[in-house]
């Protein structure tokens, strides 16, 4: 299980960084391209803060929080690997770690996170939200960790 989780972390981070590199090289800032019949959009957005641009006026704090959170996730993962069972929790944490590595790398190297996946919702506030593969991995990983911890307590 541990090897699979390590491969997953590298795969998520690698896929997300490749997507970010493509977007940075081929899109202008705020440029949008419709995909899947207009149900999905590729766009180039620079996020200097945390989720939804929180703390974007404090880039050093954001970098430090991101770096600390990524290290904490890895340490927790090492601790979790030593314990038998809870495969769902381990998988969830691996997804979260892969996304965290990619976004933290962006914050340290670029000073912002490249987001590039959007959905054309009718409500403008929702339509402006832009994600990346790492964000989805963190979200899905958090759900899997909760399920893994819930199942463990039965």
Question: Where are these predicted regions, by residue range?
Answer:
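Alpha-helical transmembrane bundles and membrane-interface segments of multipass inner-membrane proteins
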Residues: 1-154
